[in-house]
Amino acid sequence: MKYNYYYNNVPGKGLCRNNLIYTSLMNEEQTEFVQWYHNDTEYHKGQNQVVDPKLMDQKWERELIFLQFMEVEAPNMIPKIMDIDTKQRKIKLAVQGPDFWEQAKCSVNGFEKVCPNWADQMLDIISKHAELGLYKFSLHPSSYFVENGMLKSINYFFCYSEEENQIAVKDVLSHVSEDRQKKLFPAMANMGISFEQPEEFFNLQMLCFESFRDDYPSEFIEEAKAIYVRDSRI
């Protein structure tokens, strides 16, 4: 089966890489999406941000751990895992066409046309993460696919468990796009979050939600934040 590079066609920008970490592939029938944890310069068009092989290894391991954890705990909230090739570091997922953001023409205005109750579904997924003690910072709309009207969450390379040691923003900056960084730093200043010092995962989750205010309706962001605020483990 033939696989091609998978891009998002962003208005005003054209074809853009689907994420900053791995190389995204999709078959011509658009039924299989592949996360290839390989630093492909052609795909990333020379804008590779995760160039350290050790860091790529860590992202691959984190994806494996938390995606498979979700497969056990909430299989209805992720795409079906068709295959995991540990040698080539590829994860093959069953999908029904392009990702949620792409189907919405890369605009929040198209979300309801693609999935009328997208907000409720996304909040359910976030609630499940909170219930499981997870903090997932890859929240871009392209981190979801749609299957029979149901959202499916992907990109667990940027997910942490409450049981792990704290991290600092500087440790994960390579995962954050330059556009996102422009929103991140003012939010950090407003929230009193350090760039250098390890921070509580709860605070980093709140920071993450704030950095996505331009990608989602404001009321959605507030509801997402409230999930972690009211979670019993906080």
Task: Name each model-derived stretch.
Residues 8, 12-64, 68:
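ATP-binding glycine-rich loop module of kinase domains
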Residues 129-146:
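Catalytic-loop of the protein kinase fold
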Residues 24, 93-95, 145-146:
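Conserved hydrophobic "DFG−1" position in protein kinase catalytic cores
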Residues 122-130:
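Short C-lobe core helix of eukaryotic-like protein kinase catalytic domains
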